[in-house]
Structure formats: structure tokens, C-alpha cells
């Protein structure tokens, strides 16, 4: 794997949060050791308010086990 699990999670979270948001908090929880090549990253928005966006992401290995999960809070920035 060319990038770390944390970097993959952060990139996916930034994608769902959008360019108008800035990270306020990022928490990463790692699963048990295992082969991470070919892992799938998925991110989604849990909740959004006028000023904050709450998002989750996970990396799952090919066999379906959880490699890492993340939760983040983004602050919306006025353009």
C-alpha cells in the first residue's frame, strides 16, 4: 500500500466534507494487524449543521475485516 491508512481515511473524509470545510477533529481507530493491499475505503456524512459537518470513514480489507475506522468533525468556512 502506497499511503498510510490514516492518510487514506483523511483523504476520503475531506472528499465527503467538501472544499468549503476545514477539519476540526480527526480520530482514527485501528483494527488488528493484517494485509492492507487492495483495501477499500468508504466515507459518509453522519450529520450536518449550518457550521459543522460530522463524517465517518472506514478501510476494509479484501476479506471484509476492518483495518481502520475514523470519525471527523469539519467546520464550514464561508467563501
Protein language model regions, located:
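Terminal targeting signals and extreme-terminal segments of soluble enzymes
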Residues: 1-79
